[in-house]
């Protein structure tokens, strides 16, 4: 009798253990190429991950490891679906600018779906600057040949691309002499660029449109700022024209740039896993709660399946490479 009871208890324990194992969520590590938890890289990846985990039944967490480690992790992962990356244009720009080797090129990883965009890139100046737009800044330089405008950008980044587009347009539209009156100043993170502006060490900075709103219209002349050019259309932004609206072009076409956030996998990712993420990402981007959460952060969902996303990001890389060269 005791033996029978013991056997029954053993069978029950094994069943419970099996059930618990069957119901255990898959652990997924989402790495990003930033070490910050306050910027768009983390905020977008975290929001996408929460909703994607719900659709996929994951236990997932964003790990802000920084660009160098992110590349290594994705490159060396076994492709079983327990590690993915979500990151913006620096995924290819790091290689284009020569910061990282060709072994980290898009051809050596797998492009997943596009899941989000940040359209908020802009250039800002102090409120009392003698120009209100980037075109007016070029006109100011033309009228004042001894003047210069110092523009703070981060080396090898989206800000560098946006500056190059403006510089090349000034060169084509106003000539070498006016273009030479523009000086790019290497700067670090956003807070550093703002301090450089307030200290009078630069005249224009690359920033985030929503980030500078706290300084627009303030009484403190030392801190007061204004937007002089948006890189893309932003709903409700009426205080500054976009590059396109100002007539700033590249290769004869209006220039616009948003940060595009895509999912990336190791090269040997399981095909069924990638297909499932595509389907889940499509549902996430249609989810009204997700749209609302993204809007609160001033970002937006922007779904493309893996195939379309690959074509999109490869074409964008080609265009940005032409701009750099």
Predicted stretch roles:
Residues 44, 48, 64-71, 81-95, ...:
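Ligand-binding clamshell of periplasmic/extracellular solute-binding protein-like
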Residues 272-325:
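An extracytoplasmic/periplasmic, membrane-proximal ligand-sensing/linker region
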Residues 27-30, 50-59, 77-81, 96-192, ...:
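Hinge/capping helix and adjacent helix->loop/strand transition within the periplasmic-binding protein
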Residues 73-74, 152-240:
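Ligand-binding pocket segment of bilobal, Venus flytrap-like solute-binding proteins
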Residues 56-58, 76-90, 147-149, 197-207, ...:
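Alpha-to-beta junction loops
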Residues 1-30, 325:
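Short, low-complexity disordered leader/linker segments with a strong preference
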Residues 212-285:
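C-terminal lobe and pocket-closing loops
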Residues 37-38, 89-93, 119, 129-130, ...:
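Solvent-exposed loop/turn segments at secondary-structure junctions
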